[in-house]
Design a protein with these regions (language model features):
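His/Asp/Glu-rich metal-coordinating catalytic cores
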Residues: 1-68, 73-240
């Protein structure tokens, strides 16, 4: 998408599960939103992970002002070490828990790959309003399966570009998981040029149930089980 001095380019995460990465350019300044990987299809033998192509970002390295990571899931943050290896020197913005896990991930990468990465990690609060390279950037809390998740709104002359990522609306979630619909409304009133949200379940009718509603579904299974129960779950689904 190109609109006056605004360019939005998906570098991953389109028509695929995982590998999310987007370039949002405002007046020649590039914001990278998320940097994830995805697992390969079964026929990709010998391939452990698939990351986005960084060729465009390497060409435009001098114009990149920030990497923003919205939450601590591998599909949106685990390609970050590879990205920093390609374009070192770009500051990384992330909420607190995400920043903690980024530090652990970078340390693991450096020890196993025998490479030193320079990373300027800037922690943000979930409802921060800051400026990056002179451009206003708004963060807003979202409800996801890991605490500290945020959405991002980047100012442009024609309205905000809002990146919602992965979220549900649930006012009953515990602190840390809770969304802030008021902050979203305030951004909406200021004017929105483009809204970008995750849509893997968009073809399903109805609404996504909050995680805590699983309790009643599986409680009877625990009560009636004659022996040991083994349950598999997504490792980074902290709520469950």
């Amino acid at each position: 998408m190109k609109h006056n001095n605004v360019k939005i380019m998906p570098l991953g995460g389109q028509a695929e599960a995982g590998k999310s990465m987007y370039s949002i350019e405002v007046n020649g300044k590039i914001f990278i939103i998320d940097a994830g990987y995805r697992f390969p299809d079964l026929d990709k033998l010998g391939v452990d992970i698939i990351i986005p192509s960084f060729d465009y970002l390497i060409e435009r390295k001098k114009d990149i002002v920030a990497i923003i990571i919205t939450h601590a899931h591998n599909d949106v943050m685990a390609a970050l070490p590879y990205l920093l290896n390609a374009i070192q020197g770009v500051p990384v913005y992330a909420p607190n828990l995400t920043a903690d896990l980024i530090e652990m991930m970078i340390d693991h990468y450096q020890r196993h790959q025998k490479k030193n990465l320079h990373m300027e990690l800037i922690r943000v609060k979930r409802d921060d309003s800051i400026k990056i390279a002179g451009i206003p950037v708004e963060f807003f809390p979202e409800t996801h399966s890991i605490p500290g998740s945020v959405g991002v709104a980047i100012w442009t002359p024609d309205g905000y570009v809002v990146y919602g990522g992965e979220f549900i609306i649930d006012f009953g979630s515990p602190e840390g998981f809770r969304c802030n619909i008021q902050k979203m409304m305030e951004i909406g009133k200021k004017g929105v040029l483009a809204l970008m949200v995750e849509s893997s379940g968009a073809s399903n009718p109805g609404y996504t149930s909050p995680n805590h509603k699983l309790t009643n579904k599986i409680e009877s299974m625990f009560e009636d089980a004659p022996g040991r129960i083994i349950i598999s779950s997504y490792a980074q689904n902290v709520f469950r």
